[in-house]
């Protein structure tokens, strides 16, 4: 038995989960928020308890030190060296990394180089890796990439219709994201359906504040909605998803909001999507409450959101030539029952239908009617478990 920790480092946060492996038992989990800001918050959950402290945490190294000391303080571990492996979520692996990789040689430098593809994520992911390397230099460190699952896409799916030189020289292509989640729920769907994954055609919908949809055939990603960066694809909480590229030069010419690349990135990544259209919130719970109150902008934002998801599901039904199941996961996908109903009701012609008695808040499993040809599943994602499994597989 060994103890492995899965890490998801953000720019000002550190989410973690400690496992006993290979039993896959969660010993503790937690979240450190507001790193680099005053009154940082560290929360540790274990044995049915939740302990929280407020203190100033200047950087990720200090955050990791507090995390490790908390594990000792609460008698979850006796010493640092009880942890024998750490796995880090990294958003962009580019064409360098087709699978999870042990951190050695120039791996970390390449992760930082790939910040060009995920400027909001990779720098923070790399900071988490460096922090653990500084405090636990001798344990196995593994980087697990959101993009790895999508490296099975055929070239016709990942190439853009741009001059070839932009692919060969600049590596402009579709990379996708949320691959760890799509991979996990596809495997769980096969178990739920009682069929080999290799025999299934699935459409997995990871719908949270960010969102992506993937066509999965025989356990492999064959297409996915996110593109060169996590900005592409469906409409999201604060991101546009797909828009006509000509909008950008137009707004650069005729408004004062698009003067620099940073301006463009800010508007498209942080000020658009549900938030931009509703002028209210990026949170589906707030949107649904505003819709119930008759707010027109919130209603429009919700309708646009559902519409774009339906279109991608329809597109992937064509790519796969049908599907055995549509899977919903992540914050919105797992918890917003009205959203699931509305998405599926608009594509029922394909043979999918939701049973209203099964489609309730907190439900997991098959929510389809008995007669549905395409099953509709709700499966909680567990990216941390996939990370822990990969660490165990790659340990020295």
UniProtKB/Swiss-Prot annotation:
Where is substrate annotated to bind? 89
Q: Which residues form the active site?
A: 146
Q: How is the cofactor bound?
A: Mg(2+). Can also accept Mn(2+).
Q: Where is this site: Transition state stabilizer?
A: 178, 239
Concerning InterPro entries, the annotation shows: Ac/propionate_kinase, Aliphatic_acid_kin_short-chain, Aliphatic_acid_kinase_CS, ATPase_NBD
Quick check: keyword Nucleotide-binding in the entry?
yes
Q: What is its main location?
A: cytoplasm
**Location(s), subcellular:** Cytoplasm
Tell me the residue numbers annotated for binding Mg(2+).
8, 383
List the catalysed reactions.
Answer: acetate + ATP = acetyl phosphate + ADP
Example GO biological process term? acetyl-CoA biosynthetic process
Q: Tell me the pathway.
A: Metabolic intermediate biosynthesis; acetyl-CoA biosynthesis; acetyl-CoA from acetate: step 1/2
Quote the record's binding site residues for ATP: 15, 206-210, 283-285, 331-335
A single GO molecular-function term is: acetate kinase activity
Per its UniProt record, what Pfam families does this chain match?
Acetate_kinase (PF00871)
Could you tell me the EC number(s) of this protein?
Answer: 2.7.2.1
Sorted UniProt keywords: ATP-binding, Cytoplasm, Kinase, Magnesium, Metal-binding, Nucleotide-binding, Transferase
Q: Kindly list the GO CC terms recorded for this protein.
A: cytoplasm
Q: Which cofactor does it need?
A: Mg(2+); Mn(2+)
Please give the NCBIfam families that the UniProt record associates with this protein: ackA
Q: How does it assemble?
A: Homodimer.
Matching HAMAP family, A to Z?
Answer: Acetate_kinase (MF_00020)
| Known function | Catalyzes the formation of acetyl phosphate from acetate and ATP. Can also catalyze the reverse reaction.
Protein family: Belongs to the acetokinase family.
Designated name of the protein:
Acetate kinase
Q: Which organism is it from?
A: Streptococcus pneumoniae (strain 70585)
Taxonomic lineage from the root: Bacteria, Bacillati, Bacillota, Bacilli, Lactobacillales
Question: Gene name, please?
Answer: ackA
